[in-house]
From Swiss-Prot:
Ranges for the PPR repeats: 122-156, 157-191, 192-226, 228-262, 263-293, 298-328, 333-367, 368-402
Family listed: Belongs to the PPR family. P subfamily.
Protein name: Large ribosomal subunit protein mL101 (rPPR4)
Molecular function per GO: mRNA binding
Keywords: Mitochondrion, Repeat, Ribonucleoprotein, Ribosomal protein
Keyword Ribosomal protein found: yes
Length: 491
């Protein structure tokens, strides 16, 4: 497949349909939906064809795939296009490194970096690898790479410093952030709004609210990076966390004034933060502003708004918005359904919750593990453990949306095992264990100890219990070992 740089116009409608694909590549890949399976299928079809595509369009598509977390398709597109003659800039190589690390794990990313020509080992590729280390919380490797960059006289960008400071906030090492700020200044590296935001968050983590306010003052004095809406959303969130409601409201007012471009994410922050302040009237006011600014309201917007209304105990308002969304949605998002199901369950309105659960599949909604978890929690609290186990079994069988295993919380498992022990219900305890085994191979003492106590309380025996413990490689405590003499006759 030949590749070309776009020299003048990027108007894809002016392509010759004999040579080039008839529609934007990104649109073609998402023709059948945004799931990774569908995107991979469309990508494979495109790569089997003979149509040409512009280099800028490949880059734009890779960027959009990355933004949606579709790293494997983005990597495959990048690799195949290179095989077919697309020359990679150092910037392209930095992006490719990031994709390799995310699609094939960090070691593959390291190997890609090592194999790059020395001319490609610039701040861009070093910075990309550093960011990968930070994402994986590999502090020692990240710090080592930063030191190596300094030894090679490669000045890190603000993005590299931002990545490392974000790493410190995630690992609870916020005390290292001020030193990074001082180093950044000493290197004459231009900070950006993210730099200031992560600095503010680090100070807030140590309850240094006056320090946070000094950062804003410094931004205003410096003048190179003006506080934007993200700065004030960050500030408002910090004030809310600190219980400083009046200051939080003032920051939110600043946020509104800074949102001149009517940014969707800014509206989301406003709704969430006014909700955390308990300002229901303001929540509705911002919702109306969002609807005026962006008439085609997305599922994500409805999800956030309904969640906020539920937290503010405005169930009638949440129901009204749900009906509005349901009447106009193109995709029946089960996450939104789950919010209302959860609200009904919380209020004890289990019939309404069940009605929603039954209607969802008819509208194209796919019940997920969260749906069944909500019902499981309700039945556990209601003492209906048989139904709780049924719901748990369904949640485990569905698993997580990303393909991972779903398991109930340790608190739920303890509550169930405690109940079965009190009721001397051996069958219930064994059923729970079997359900858990469908989701994990790691059944430990926290399950077997109450199981053995349940057998003992019920006056029942399990001749092979010691063998089970040995097979599962489980070591129980001394008190449980004594009960084994009653429960198990095997040696």
């Amino acid at each position: 497949m030949a590749m070309r740089h776009l020299s003048r116009s990027r108007d894809v409608t002016k392509r010759s349909t004999k040579k080039y694909i008839e529609e934007p590549l990104y649109n073609r890949l998402f023709k059948d939906g945004g799931t990774e399976v569908k995107v991979r299928q469309q990508l494979n079809q495109f790569l089997k064809g003979t149509k040409h595509v512009f280099k800028w369009e490949v880059g734009d598509t890779i960027k959009k795939l990355r933004n949606r977390g579709l790293y494997y398709p983005a990597l495959k597109l990048s690799e195949v296009m290179e095989e077919r003659g697309m020359n990679k800039t150092v910037s392209d190589q930095a992006i490719h490194l990031d994709l390799v690390a995310k699609a094939r794990e960090i070691t593959a990313g390291e190997n890609y970096f090592v194999d790059l020509p020395e001319t490609s080992k610039t701040e861009l590729t070093y910075g990309s690898l550093l960011n990968c280390y930070c994402k994986e919380l590999l502090t020692e490797k990240a710090e080592g790479l930063l030191n190596k960059m300094k030894e090679l006289n490669i000045t890190p960008s603000s993005m590299s410093y931002n990545s490392l400071m974000t790493l410190y906030t995630k690992t609870g090492e916020t005390e290292k952030v001020p030193a990074m700020i001082q180093e950044l200044k000493a290197e004459n590296v231009m900070p950006d709004s993210y730099t200031y935001n992560v600095w503010m968050r680090a100070l807030a983590a140590t309850n240094d609210i006056s320090g946070v306010e000094r950062v804003i003052e410094e931004m205003n004095r410096d003048g190179r990076v003006a506080p934007d809406w993200t700065t004030y959303s960050n500030m408002a969130s910090i004030y809310v966390d600190a219980g400083l409601s009046q200051k939080a409201e003032k920051a939110l007012q600043e946020l509104e004034m800074k949102n001149t471009q009517r940014d969707f994410t800014a509206y989301q922050f406003l709704i969430t933060l006014y909700g955390r302040l308990g300002k229901l009237t303001e929540v509705y006011r911002i919702w109306r502003s969002l609807r005026l600014a962006i008439p085609k309201t997305s599922n994500v917007a409805y999800l956030n708004m309904i969640q906020v209304l539920v937290k503010l105990n405005d169930l009638p308002g949440a129901e009204t918005l749900f009906k509005e969304w349901q009447a106009n949605c193109s995709t029946y998002d089960i996450r939104i359904v789950n919010v209302l199901i959860g609200a009904y369950a919380q209020e004890g309105l289990i019939q309404k919750a069940n009605e929603l659960k039954e209607k969802a599949p008819r509208r194209g909604g796919k019940l997920n593990a969260k749906t069944w978890e909500i019902f499981m929690d309700y039945y556990v609290k209601s003492g209906d453990m048989a139904r709780a186990l049924e719901c748990m079994s369904k949640a485990v069988s569905i698993g997580k949306g990303d393909g991972g295993k779903w398991l109930p919380s340790p608190e739920t498992v303890r509550a169930l095992m405690s109940y079965f022990e009190q009721k001397k219900d051996v069958n219930g305890a064994e059923n729970l264990l079997e359900i858990l085994k469908n989701g994990t191979d790691n059944i430990g003492a926290e399950i077997f100890e109450p199981l053995i106590r349940t057998y003992a309380a019920a006056g029942k025996s399990h001749p092979a219990m010691r063998r089970r413990l040995k097979m599962e490689n489980v070591e129980v405590n001394e008190a449980t070992k004594k009960l084994l003499d009653e429960v198990s006759q095997d040696v």
